[in-house]
Amino acid sequence: MTAQMIAIANQKGGVGKTTTCTNLGIGLAREGKKVMLVDAYPQGSLTISLGYPQPDKLPFTLSEAMGHILMDEPIPQGEGVLHHPEGVDFIPANIQLSGMEVSLVNAMSRETVLRQYLETVKEQYSHILIDCQPSLGMLTVNALAAAGRIIIPVQAEYLPAKGLEQLLSTIGKVKRQLNPKLQVDGILLTMVDNRTNFAKEISTLLRDTYGNQIRVFCSEIPHSVRAKEISAEGKSIFVHDPHGRVAEGYRNLTKEVLNLEKQREKHSADLSR
């Protein structure tokens, strides 16, 4: 088993990256997959949403793991990896990661430190999902250099075109220089308010603008007050509000992501005949 590595990325904040990473990850685990989540955000948003409200008190986080790689020191198997009761493992993050980002600037192979760490764990999982911070800094570049695929959550409340252009330009650069296998799985519309026409207009605009280059997922994540409550609870939407529209949205996304993988495997098998 070698993990599919998926970065959840968008340099704009507040678009649902952490919520998507958590619920897609747990959605995959509910489908029998072995999943690891990676918090690559110094604020520790993913860590908090998985039930650790004080990430700064954790003794071993992604920062320490990357520090071991930088110093060329072995990492004891499983060191720092936490387990969530809904069936996913995760490597937490805290404010120390900001210092690590500064250290990376002068490091050798600075763009691939996260990849080197994930190489040490990838055989144990079917999927590794990376929650990126809202910037295009060195940590996000590390995530893109490590990932095989990217999902881009986009809030359906504003015109995202300019930010997307920057992100796609960075993805193109990483693909050319560091990670030729990198591909965009798709754009995921989040916080969709179906009571307004605006969300539909954004969806149509995205499909018209990027539809030829990039998939826009059929699954959409609706706007919901209940979804905002879950980050304080340390639970997924599947436990917090299992019959709600957000849980349905993430169930659909999970199926869509798994179907994409099947299509790719079939395509690869057909090519190798």
Roles of regions detected by a PLM:
Residues 1-273:
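P-loop NTP-binding core
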